[in-house]
């Protein structure tokens, strides 16, 4: 609820979610925008022979009829209407994975183009120690690097929240480490 309020998600909003994973935030976004809103999931093609983790949400038309999937290479975000919000949680660092060969600047510009004027690009990810370049093994990224990449696409920085920040996070261990 805190993150939805911070992102100013409203009933009726049309929103996008990049790399929705297993669909946890998809469910939250769907309920937040309500029956007059819509959630567009943007993801690459699924691995061969494997359904995407968010497939159960797409299949549940009783509870999530306002959710649809659009396959993308992330350098184009083909939403059928301007979006109030594009959300990505704990996956921005994945866009830097070497095997993805993604042009981050082009991807961020595609997000910018998909948003209506005043729209929000909401990036939530695990913070690395300052100055640490992207590290796939840790599943973390330097917030300053993210900010620089996003600003370069034409965005204005509107704020950040510490509500999920853990002051005891060592930042030099993988996010799945129990410490």
Model-derived segments and their meaning:
Residues 83-105:
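A short SAM/SAH-binding and catalytic strip from SAM-dependent methyltransferases
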Residues 23-27:
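Glycine-rich SAM-binding Motif I of class I
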Residues 10-21:
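Conserved class I S-adenosyl-L-methionine
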Residues 11-12, 35-37, 115-121:
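Short glycine-dipeptide loop
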Residues 30-34, 102-117:
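A short glycine-rich, Lys/Arg-flanked "PGG" loop and its adjoining helix->strand segment in the class I
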Residues 133-160:
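Conserved Class I S-adenosyl-L-methionine
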Residues 64, 77-87:
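A short acidic, Gly/Pro-enriched loop at the edge of an enzyme's catalytic core
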Residues 108, 118-127:
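Conserved beta-strand signature within the Rossmann-like core of class I S-adenosyl-L-methionine
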